[in-house]
Curated annotation (Swiss-Prot):
Zn(2+) binds at H17, H19, H197, D278. It holds the Pfam family A_deaminase. This is Adenine deaminase. Belongs to the metallo-dependent hydrolases superfamily. Adenosine and AMP deaminases family. Adenine deaminase type 2 subfamily. The active site is at E200. One of its GO terms (cellular component) is cytosol. Its cofactor is Zn(2+). InterPro entries: A_deaminase_dom, ADE, Ado/ade_deaminase, Metal_Hydrolase.
Length: 337
């Protein structure tokens, strides 16, 4: 097991499911609160950590949105993103496609360009300093209405050349993908890639809607695809990637026992599964922690993790030439280990 953990630690990989607001560690939360004179509902860092005891997605979202209140300036968003990039770099993440939730900021009076300029400054720094490649995916909050999503897409117009795609996150059950069919169609017309959280707490019908109605390019989470055999076969044949987040699933009680996690089964069925950290500050683990958890609890072997790492590059929105270059780095690492 020790050799496998060492192998995983340095394995070249991409991360395709990371909410940048969900990488806000309690220490940085307090630092930004002090900087911006924001009063937090917690007396200290340990109290924040103690509050990270969720029973479901909604309980997590309630505290998640509280945390965003400390983010006010371009510097704040840059510091937030850089903290993640430094941490991901330690896990040998070569490429990251990060979600951001502009509505959670614009709704509290933070201009869209403040969010974007801060994130773009961090991306420029990460590319220059760490050699990482980074793409942005702008998520619509599904508990809000489609008109709010349209307004957000309009705000993004000046930055569309800096945004790879749009996504759909927040409270899944009761907010099906079909609620956002028109804004996703417009985003597609603008040349953006499309992803959506589906099949995390919602059943397999949410995944089917995301594929059939939104015409998404990638499935975020997708655990409950196991409920629909035809959908699994379709996903395997189309080689659409699933961005699965094991520790998130455990923390939110989606899969309470990692020994029962569906990822190994989906991998054996030929689906293009990837491993990701989702909201690592809240769920207690970055991407390598998620890899290691599946090694420990699911018995995955080195060859499985190589396939998953390959999937992470193949499932990205990078140009084919860049994907090939990253796969070459991966192959050389495997050959040299």
């Amino acid at each position: 097991m020790n050799n496998l953990i060492k192998f995983i630690a340095a394995l070249p990989k991409a991360e395709l499911h990371l909410h940048i607001e969900g990488s806000l560690e309690p220490e940085l939360m307090f630092e930004l609160a002090k900087r911006n004179k924001v009063t937090l509902p917690f007396p200290d860092v340990e109290s924040v950590k103690a509050a990270y005891n969720f029973n479901n997605l909604q309980e997590f979202l309630d505290i998640y949105y509280q945390g965003t209140n400390v983010l006010k300036t371009e510097e704040d968003f840059c510091d937030l993103a850089m903290a993640y990039f430094y941490r991901a770099h330690r896990d040998n993440v070569l490429h990251s496609e990060i979600f951001f939730d502009p509505q959670s900021h614009t709704e509290r009076g933070i201009p869209f360009n403040v969010v974007m300029n801060g994130l773009l400054a961090a991306i420029t720094k990460a590319e220059a300093e760490l050699g990482m490649s980074v793409q942005l995916i702008m998520c619509f909050l599904r508990h809000l209405d489609e008109e709010s999503a349209f307004a957000t897409l309009r705000m993004a117009e000046p930055f569309l050349d800096k945004i790879a795609g749009v996504g759909l996150d927040s409270s899944e059950v009761g907010n099906p993908p079909s609620k956002f069919r028109h804004v996703f169609a417009e985003a597609r017309q603008k040349g953006l890639k499309l992803v959506a959280h589906a099949g995390e707490e919602g059943d397999a019908s949410y995944i089917k809607e995301a594929l059939d109605i939104l015409n998404i390019d990638r499935i975020d989470h997708g655990n409950r695809i196991t409920e629909d055999r035809l959908l699994m076969t379709r996903a395997a044949r189309s080689a659409i990637a699933l961005t699965i987040c094991p520790l998130s699933n455990q923390k939110l009680q989606v899969v309470p026992d990692l020994r029962n996690h569906p990822l190994p089964y989906l991998l054996r069925q030929g689906l293009r599964v990837t491993i990701n950290s989702d909201d690592p500050a809240y769920f207690g683990g970055y991407v390598n922690d998620n890899y290691k958890a599946l090694a420990e609890y699911c018995g995955l072997k080195a060859a499985d993790f190589v396939e998953i790492a390959r999937n992470s590059f193949l499932g990205s929105f990078l140009p084919d030439q860049t994907v090939a270059a990253y796969l070459d780095v991966l192959d050389k690492y495997v050959d040299s280990f």
